[in-house]
Amino acid sequence: MDIMLSHFTALEAIRRQETRWILEKDRPARTHIMGNVPAEAPTDGEVAALLARSPLLAGLSRPLETLIPRGAGRRRSRLVKTHVCAQLIPAGSFLELAPGVRCVSPEHLVVQLAPLLSELELIVLLSELLGIYAVMPNVEGGMFQRRRPVTTRELIANHLDALGSFPGVAKVRRAMRHACVGSGSPRETKLSLRLGLNPARGGYGLDVLSMNAPLEVRRIHNMMKKGIRKPDILLRAPSGATRNGRALLGAAVEYDGKDHATEEAHQRDAARHNELTAIGVVEYLVTKAQYRDLAYMDGLVAQIRRDLGTPAKRKTRARARRHRELRQELYAELELIDGLNWNGLERARRRAENNDEAPGNDGWETVPVEAYGLD
């Protein structure tokens, strides 16, 4: 008996440390994997037998969400919940975790979950799958680091093309435009979104060049020795920008969530700061308290703009006030996205009821014209 994990069970399986080597190795190879959705739903007895012999499955939340084809009988019990796959899915839609146990691929998972998530939740999920971390509530820090992302923009885009008009495809395409690549933690993702999203979406509209990408530096204590620094977030400087008479590559923004840094950590921070400065990167550190302080973040971004030579667009008082409200709303909504509880659409529904808005609008489906940079 075969079983295909789907939806939130698949997400949980993809996040497990036991599956990381399957996901991180030969990512393009899985695009050629063919197969069919199991013909029928597993019985409780069959699921119980699988749980008994598979530590991976035994560690997943119940009921297990599984995929079945159209025409197969739906089932929902204490152990299993089925989802109908209404049409054929292309190669690359699943991977094998163990004999008889398959799971939808990261590329297909985001399409499955898209109708169930707000667009901001989908952006955060995509940023995790395109990043080098996995949310794991039962490990220290609530996450673990990956050696490399489990998917890429190209793999997702190719899968969307192969799916055609499959439900969820259009929403994933929209979210992909804003998703982070290379993020090292949920907080880095949220900080990058706040810095990079357009002001009409609650961001500061800065140009995020990269996240955790390697930069070659010279070690200050030994100028003959080369080294690598990987800024959490690197903001692009305009072509030809200079600072203090030197070429400016960009601005690095590092998130430091530690409440009390050690003297050794301070020394590492100082060494990194000096090495980045030497290659034309101005660096800023954002602490947990500063991240939560909207007035501080507004001032920090204003200083970054001055360093980069990219002044903010002039705004009317009304628009400036509205954009500040949106920045506060984005911060608050991101704080509610923990990677485990996906309630964004329900929150949007409640807001719509309170504001007499059209139901089903999470605030991202219809955006002001300035969101497209036309103002």
Predicted feature descriptions by range:
Residues 146-375:
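Surface segments flanking catalytic/ligand-binding clefts of nucleic-acid enzymes
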Residues 1-168, 312-375:
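Short gly/ser-rich loop at a beta-strand->alpha-helix junction or flexible surface loop bordering the NTP-binding
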